[in-house]
Amino acid sequence: MEIRCNLCPRHCNALRTDTEGLGFCRSPLIPQVNLIAPHFGEEPVISGTHGSGTVFFEGCSLGCIFCQNHKISCGLSGNAIPMKAEVLADRYLELEDSGVHNINLVTFMHYAPEVARSIEITRALGLKIPVVANISGYEEVSTLKMLDGLIDIYLTDMKFYSQAVSSELAHAPDYFMKTCLATDEMVRQTGDPVLDGQSMLKKGTIVRHLMLPGYLFDTKHILDYLVSRYGDKIYISLMNQYTPPAELMDKLPQRLTRTVPAGHYRQLTDYLMELGQTNAFIQESDASGNEFLPQFR
């Protein structure tokens, strides 16, 4: 099979086949999976006590220059396993049998048609736990609509507010506009957050924002927008875990070669509370570091 791909906002119109991809994500049509394992580094309502059943896909349509998963996001590593929908569906069931709280699909939207089919198959085979779409936020609404009724939880990002910042750090000047439209669609699909008896999220949308050193005003604008637009119809997760990847240090702007100062993070968590947001997650002061990073192949 081959297509001219326009799944993401970059609209490459690039040729993609089952084995080759010439677009920005550099990915073929068949999903390339690097790692499948329980993961304990997500928000408490996702990871719980048994972990989130995480499937890490290779490639990415955003390509932030500071990505902590750059080993698998900047093109293909050479270590991925191609998995069609039927194989993925079986892997989800194996994860469910291991006792995880949910199936957590990480950075898969460039494979959306095949992943959507995998969810349909696994549901038909009896999967009962929630399916989480763990994505960058830089999505096309038309592609998200392929997942309508299949995704229980969106775990998404709102990374940048300023056009100048998103251009500098992800070569995506339209990031904020596209992400606002995409987030509206995610919230429409999931509705308000719903917790089960163990305080695990069954349905809803979590919007993450990773604070970056030197970009406080971007963070403030994003919090203003999210609270005014959605309030407690979503969870806001304000993160301070940014750790400059050692392998990328020579390519990063100077301000991104350090972590977020603790005082800056406290300032913004206080601001989020002042805005009146109740559904929120904040991190401990020592959240930066590599201990929660997956061990990719």
Where do the PLM segments sit?
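Auxiliary Fe-S-binding modules of radical SAM enzymes
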Residues: 1-21, 191-297
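Conserved Radical SAM active-site core
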Residues: 26-153, 162-163
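Hydrophobic faces of well-ordered beta-strands that scaffold small-molecule active sites
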Residues: 53, 103, 131-133, 154-156, ...
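Short glycine-enriched, charge-decorated loop/helix-capping segments at active-site entrances
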Residues: 71-81, 168-173, 251-259
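Conserved radical SAM core fold
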Residues: 73, 112, 137-140, 158-176, ...
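Conserved glycine-rich "GG(E/T)P / GGGxP" loop and the immediately following alpha-helix
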Residues: 96-121, 168, 174, 184, ...
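Non-cysteine beta-strand/loop elements that form the S-adenosyl-L-methionine
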Residues: 148-165, 233-241
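Anionic-ligand binding region
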Residues: 167-197
